Regions:
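Short glycine-rich, flexible loops that bind phosphorylated cofactors or substrates
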Residues: 109, 163, 264-266, 335
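Short, glycine/charged-enriched hinge/interface segments at domain edges or termini
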Residues: 2-12, 65-231, 236
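Acidic, glycine-rich loop-and-beta core segments that form the ion-binding/anion-interacting portion
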Residues: 215-292
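Short acidic, glycine/serine/threonine-rich loops at helix termini
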Residues: 112-114, 166-167, 196-202, 242-244, ...
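Intrinsically disordered, low-complexity, positively charged segments
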Residues: 9-76, 160
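N-terminal intrinsically disordered, low-complexity, charge/repeat-rich segments that act as generic
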Residues: 1-21, 222, 255, 269-275
């Protein structure tokens, strides 16, 4: 009589795993002011409202001539140029029966109510300007506040600053912005088979050795998200070394991210090491590649019991706890990359309080 096989583990679906993971990712509270020039990719800690209108006054959207439409009601008319208004200067009131030479971005002079583009004008030998087509009031004029009205919220709290957003912040005169502090992330790989590119030539590689590619792309991905990354290198395949690395990293980081060692082999030490210092809440998910994924907490004192879901009690227990979030990625590079994009990236953005 053969023994019954133990029931197979039911893997958590990706959507359920992500929802549970994000439940543990409470936004960081620290903020800092940084120069707008240096704020690319950072997340706003407060909304930005404009103290001015953009543009600040009516201005020309074309190179041409500012006119009074009433002066041109009779059709083709030749008028003298009474003034010249380049961008950055302010003209005088436009005299009746005259035009003002005006350039793109220059303020519309008082009395003018349209701009005729220079292609629709003929400059005669005597300097008079003949208008070929009668303009409509408001033609080629950008109105004050057309882009941004005074008091309008232009960027929301929790918005990640893009190059376009930085330009918008600068357009309302902001040289500095308040952003969420950078998450501190400790990164290390596990595996005695790993070697660093440049340290060993391909022809000198020992049988079974591979180059540590995960270290490079994971650090780059974290940096692009705005993290402050501590690269802790490669940890040997033994439990004591793994525990020591986790314990040390938990003292001064918000998140510990590892690659490798999260499966169920005899040389996979991440699971017991994390459980000895804290707890695991997620272990393996129903995706391929990427099944060997783990989430937990590393600290001197486990803030919640192992396996507790992201309930209000569990989340409350994490607040103020001494330690760090832990995420373990598979060692396979493709699996590691996929699980980072699907799970780690949204987790980090939630830590940053990102709303999109």
């Amino acid at each position: 009589m053969t023994a019954e096989k133990p029931p197979r583990q039911t893997l958590k679906p990706l959507d359920d795993a992500l929802a549970e993971l994000l439940g543990f990712a409470q936004p960081l509270t620290g903020t800092e002011q940084v120069a707008t020039f240096e704020a690319d990719g950072r997340v706003l800690a407060q909304e930005l409202a404009s103290n001015l209108q953009v543009p600040p006054q009516d201005n020309s959207s074309m190179d041409g001539y500012a006119v009074r439409c009433a002066d041109l009601a009779s059709g083709w008319v030749a008028l003298p140029v009474s003034q010249r208004i380049p961008a950055g200067s302010t003209g005088a009131e436009l005299a009746q029966k005259s035009v003002a030479r005006i350039f793109t971005g220059a303020p519309i002079p008082l009395g003018a109510d349209a701009v005729v583009m220079q292609e629709d004008c003929d400059v005669q030998a005597d300097g008079m300007v003949r208008i070929k087509a009668a303009p409509k009031p408001g033609q080629w004029i950008r109105r004050a506040g057309e882009d941004v009205t005074q008091g309008a919220v232009v960027l929301a709290k929790g918005e990640r600053l893009t190059p376009a957003a930085l330009g918008l912040a600068a357009s309302i005169g902001l040289s500095r912005v308040r952003v969420v502090r950078r998450p501190k992330v400790a990164l290390f790989s596990t595996g005695d088979e790993l070697v660093m590119p440049g340290e060993v030539a391909p022809e000198d590689m020992k049988p079974g050795a591979i180059y540590n590619s995960n270290r490079f792309f994971l650090k780059a991905l974290l940096t692009r998200l705005g993290c402050e990354v501590s690269d802790l290198g490669i940890v040997p395949d033994n439990r004591a070394a793994t525990i020591e690395a986790l314990r040390g990293a938990a003292q001064s980081h918000d998140l510990i991210l590892t690659s490798g060692g999260v499966s169920v082999g005899e040389e996979d030490h991440i699971k017991p090491a994390v459980q000895s210092l804290g707890h695991l809440d997620l272990w393996q998910i129903a995706i391929k590649p990427g099944k060997p994924f783990a989430y937990g907490w590393v600290g001197v004192d486990a803030p919640v019991t192992a396996g507790m879901a992201a309930t209000e009690a569990a989340i409350s227990a994490l607040e103020g706890a001494s330690g760090a979030h832990f995420i373990g990625l598979p060692g396979n590079p493709v699996s590691s990359f996929v699980t980072f994009l699907l799970l780690v990236r949204p987790f980090v953005l939630k830590l940053l309080g990102c709303t999109k």
